[in-house]
């Protein structure tokens, strides 16, 4: 690979182009020649005044400071410099790029555009910090009327505000109140939901009544289900009602002689 020397005038570019053309005529293949390490620096120094003039007009157009720029699209074009020494036959155009070192040391160049050298390039609407959400929550908490009234109350009562630690504790308490507990499966008979507690109380009450019913009804099978137990209890109650009715009728038919008083 043969290095190409780039000068400040256009004659060197034309000479490099003719040399590249001769190489193409002999071999028939396009040959790309690399540039030395200092070529980019020389290129930036050469094109600093020419290639940045359209950007100056564009910046003035955006800021509203320039009134002499053309308004039609066809009357204003950005010049694209072509390096004929590098790609003569292929028809490629050279694109001027800016390295990171040039941007880091371009304070004077930025000042020429009316921008301060220590200008912050990050937008105020974009927060790249990892704790941005936490900071927004703390700012919203500090700006809330409750926090303002609390601080005023502490100052009027003579108490010393505890600062960020107290606010973080209060914020943690609010988060604990608003948070939803994890759905951990409780042990059998140890549910804490109100509906679960009510259901457990109802089942316990039914079990107690069934147990009392089993004690009242003789020869009841305790291994059967609740429906069969209730049917047996109903049959037993009917039997008791018939016995009561029979005893009442016998009592009416019975005539007892009262004992004579001595």
Swiss-Prot record:
The keyword Isomerase does not apply. Residues 190-240 form the bHLH domain. It is found in: Nucleus. GO terms for molecular function: cis-regulatory region sequence-specific DNA binding; DNA-binding transcription factor activity; protein dimerization activity. Residues 8-25 have a biased composition (Gly residues). The keyword Transcription regulation applies. Transmembrane segments: none annotated. It holds the Pfam family HLH. GO terms for cellular component: nucleus. One of its GO terms (biological process) is regulation of DNA-templated transcription. This is Transcription factor bHLH81. It comes from Arabidopsis thaliana.
């Amino acid at each position: 690979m043969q290095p190409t020397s780039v000068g400040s005038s256009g004659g060197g570019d034309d000479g490099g182009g003719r040399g590249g053309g001769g190489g193409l005529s002999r071999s028939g293949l396009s040959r790309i020649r690399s540039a030395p390490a200092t070529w980019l620096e020389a290129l930036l120094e050469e094109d600093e005044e020419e290639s940045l003039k359209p950007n100056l007009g564009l910046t003035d157009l955006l800021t509203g400071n320039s009134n002499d720029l053309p308004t039609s699209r066809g009357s204003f074009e950005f010049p694209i410099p072509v390096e004929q020494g590098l790609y003569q036959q292929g028809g490629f155009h050279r694109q001027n790029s800016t390295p990171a070192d040039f941007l880091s040391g371009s304070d004077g160049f930025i000042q020429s555009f009316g921008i301060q050298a220590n200008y912050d390039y990050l937008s105020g609407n974009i927060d790249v910090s990892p704790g941005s959400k936490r900071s927004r929550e703390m700012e919203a908490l500090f700006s809330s009327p409750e926090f303002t009234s609390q601080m005023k109350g502490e100052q009027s009562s003579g108490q010393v505000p505890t600062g960020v630690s107290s606010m973080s504790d209060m914020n943690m308490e609010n988060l604990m109140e608003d948070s939803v507990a994890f759905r951990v499966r409780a042990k059998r008979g140890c549910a804490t939901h109100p509906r679960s507690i009510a259901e457990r109380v109802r089942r316990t009450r039914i079990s107690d009544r069934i147990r009392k019913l089993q004690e009242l009804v003789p020869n009841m099978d305790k291994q059967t289900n609740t429906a069969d137990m209730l049917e047996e209890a109903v049959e037993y109650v009917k039997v008791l009602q018939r016995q009561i009715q029979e005893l009442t009728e016998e009592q009416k038919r019975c005539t007892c002689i009262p004992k004579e008083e001595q």
